[in-house]
Every structure is written in C-alpha cells, then in structure tokens.
C-alpha cells in the first residue's frame, strides 16, 4: 500500500532486510499496517468529522500532507457509492431524457429518416470516441503531475493541449467539407444533410473531453454530473425544436452540434473553477532544456493517448458497426433495427458515463500502488439493475414494448431484441474494463479490441443485412470480447498482487550469474 503522493511505478523487486533470518524494516512496517488498516476501514463507515459548509455537505478534514491539487483516496464501498452516485444519477437522467427524445423523434420522422439518423449518430460516436482518448491522456498526465508535487504545471500544460485541439478541429472542418458527399454516398444516405454538423460535433467533443478530464482528475464528480445534465438537456431541447420544426435529419444533427458547443463551454468554466487553487498556478521558469524525466513522461503520455485513441475508436466501432453495416447492406430494414439498437445501447451509454468515474479512480489508485476493484464493483452494481430489467422486457414482451415506444412500423425486428440486449450487456462490461485497464497503463488491451472489431466486421457482413442474424453475430463477438477482457483483468491483478506478496514477505529475485 503506497503513500498518496508516491511516484507511480511497480513495486521493487527486492526488500531491504537485515541479517539472515531477520525480518526487514519494510516487512515489519507492512505487518504493522496490516493491523492498523482495518481500524481505518471501520472508522470510514462512522460519522464524518469535518467542517460544515453552508449549502453543502460536510467537508472532511484533509490529511496532514497532501500534494497540491491531489485529492486523498477513500477505498471503501460507501465512498465509492458516494463518489459514483452523482455521475450515475446524471447518467440515468440523461439516458431517460434520451429515451424520451428517441420516442418523440421516431414519431416525428419517417422510418427511412429514422434509420438515417441512427447511422449519423453511430458515425458521431465512432468519431468522438478518439476524443475520449484525449481524456485518458489528460487524466493520466494531470494525476502524475499531482502525485509528483508539480500541480503548478497543470494549467500551462492544459492551455497547450487546448491550442492543439483547436488547430485539429480547424483541419477537420476542411477535410469534412471536402468529403461530405462521399461520406453520404458510402453510408447510403440520399444527401449530405447533417454530415458536416455531426462530424464537427464529434470534433468539438475533443475539447469537451479535455475539460472533463480535468474534472475527473480533480475528482469533481458533482461538477462532471452537472455537465452531463447540461449536455443532455440542451440536446433534448434543440433536437425536439429542430425536428418538430420540419428540419428532419439535418435538424437532428444541428441539435447535437449545439449541445456539444454549450457543454464544452460549460465544462471549460467548471474546470477553470475547479483548478483555481493558487497551488496550481503556473510558475515562470528559467527556460533551458527539458529534464530527462519530463521527456520520459511525455513519451509515456503519447503512448497512453495513442493506445486510448485506437482503443476507444474501436469501442465506438463495436457499439455501432451493426446498425451502420445493416443500413448499408439492407437500407429497408435499418429503421426497425435502429429501434432495438437505440433501446439496447442505452446500457452502453450508461457504462460510458460510469467510466468517467472509474478511469480516474483506477489511475490514481494504481499510481498509489493499490487497485480500484471496489470502484469497478460499484459501477457494475449501478449497471446491473437496468440491464436485468431491459433483458426481461426483451425476452418476455419485446413486440408490445417496441410498439408502445416506437410504433408498430418500427417493431418488426422484435425477435432480434433479446440477443442485442445481451450483446450490449457484454459490451458494457468491456467498456468499463477498458477504462479501468487504461487507467492502469495496460496499453496492450488494444490488441483485444482490434481482434474483436475485425471479427465484428466479418460476422456482421456475413449476416447480410438480416436483423436477427446481425444481432446474433453481434452477441457472439461481444461475448468473446467480454470474456477476453475479464481474463486480461484477472491476469493483470494476479500479477500485481504477486508483486505485492513478493514485497510483503521479503522474497527477492536471485541476481543473474
């Protein structure tokens, strides 16, 4: 169990010890800690001792020494529920609002237009997921700066990231304007209405991810939840107004674009407020060459972001490849399939929202030498109830449910509802496991996502646009991928605990001869 401000790194391979047969000092301290730790765990469930703040909850008294900008960890289930609660509640509210929006839009547009909207939304999520890779990089870099006592570098580093993102958005705009007609033809869309707006919204997501990453690194989960609510509320209002006004597919894309703009501005304001601590203010240095440690940190950050960029893009592909390929192969059935797709993929959106809590928790606790298994358990607990409820509906009353929610004309793919719900339950676990393992710096899990994505493209293509066959193909892929992620999770933690046990009992590697 490492100190809160310790520099990230694996446990030592050897232990300082006395003479033969004598326990080392580090082993003695470990044994004392194992006796004292349960007292801290039991005290955590008692009344909090803190300072009452008007209009807010009790603020716990800080530990004696905490690195500037670094929030201390509480590794109890109760603390995990309290931290994840606001994000989970916001995710539920936004998903409910999204479900109501889906119902309203389905009744305002034709079946064909509804399928086109589903394709554009799928494209948005595929292209916005790499923006989430920036979020992973922000969380990992900022937590490293906090842990090393260099929180004063955070603002300067983030300002540079913002400038790079703005340039990238400008380049994206030029490319999208040049390729919008080709993209529309490839998707089988009748025109390019909404393509530019939906792709630019995905680009703006990059900026939004930077500031949400700052909120996560600061563990400002209530602010993060408020930002999720703002994004969902603006999206619901704008889409309803534009689609009801007769703008159709283009109106839907405009609503998404406006909601991302507003959410980005709001997140930027929240992040600036969260990091207003003078301890994080930039310090003017004397210039000169960067030290080797900083260059090493930058290379490590680039590797983390690159892996997350690929991995999260593949998660977006896995979430939407079925509806995109079905729309391309059999456009007449994309509307009914989009109905079961939207209904079942609410689980994945919930997992993505909870991943916003799990990623920084895993990153910070792993850097401290611990783990976030309890926090993962909390997120799975939050997902379990809606998953079981939706699966029950999909198994026992699929057609009445789809008819009630979407209308009879979009209920013809009811037989594919249950396998698709099971597939999305598996993908939800994969999303959470990916966020967790990226937090531990396990970049190699991208290989699992590459294999799963390739298999998904092959099997969904072989389904030839049939809704039932497409859903079962998706289930096979997602189940195999979830199993692989679970195995990777166990392997990483067995290895991690093995290093801890080696250190705890004074085992050491024999020197090479």
Where in this protein do the model-derived segments appear?
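Membrane-water interface segments that mark the loop-to-transmembrane alpha-helix transition
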Residues: 79-94, 98, 120, 132-181, ...
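Helix-loop junctions and terminal segments of transmembrane helices
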Residues: 132-148, 217, 340, 344-368, ...
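Signature of the first transmembrane helix
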Residues: 45, 58-64, 76-136, 306-329
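N-terminal membrane topogenesis motif
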Residues: 1-97, 267-271, 288-308, 488-513
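Membrane-interface junctions at transmembrane-helix termini in multi-pass inner-membrane proteins
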Residues: 205-226, 364, 422-448
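Alpha-helical transmembrane segments of multi-pass membrane transport and lipid-handling proteins
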Residues: 62, 159-187, 237, 241, ...
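Hydrophobic alpha-helical transmembrane segments
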Residues: 192-197, 225-277, 468-493
